[in-house]
Amino acid sequence: MAVQQNKKSRSKRGMRRSHDSLSTAQLSVDATSGELHRRHNVTADGFYRGVKVINK
C-alpha cells in the first residue's frame, strides 16, 4: 500500500482538486425543430445540424 513521504499542504491539496469540479451540460436549440439538445449530439427526433441522420 502506498504511504506518502511528506504531508501535503492545504494549498497543494486545493491546487490538485481545482480541476475536479463538474460543469453543467451545454444545451443548444435545434434549428429545424426548436428542440433543446446537448451540443454536438443528435436530437431525440434524429436531427443533427439541421439534417435528418437517424430514421425512426
UniProtKB/Swiss-Prot annotation:
GO terms for biological process: translation. Keywords: Ribonucleoprotein, Ribosomal protein. It comes from the Bacteria. The keyword Ion transport does not apply. PANTHER family: 50S RIBOSOMAL PROTEIN L32, LARGE RIBOSOMAL SUBUNIT PROTEIN BL32. SUPFAM superfamilies: Zn-binding ribosomal proteins (SSF57829). Residues 21-31 have a biased composition (Polar residues). One of its GO terms (molecular function) is structural constituent of ribosome. Residues 7-16 have a biased composition (Basic residues). HAMAP family: Ribosomal_bL32. The keyword Oxidoreductase does not apply. This is Large ribosomal subunit protein bL32. Residues 1-38 are annotated as: Disordered. Belongs to the bacterial ribosomal protein bL32 family. GO terms for cellular component: large ribosomal subunit.
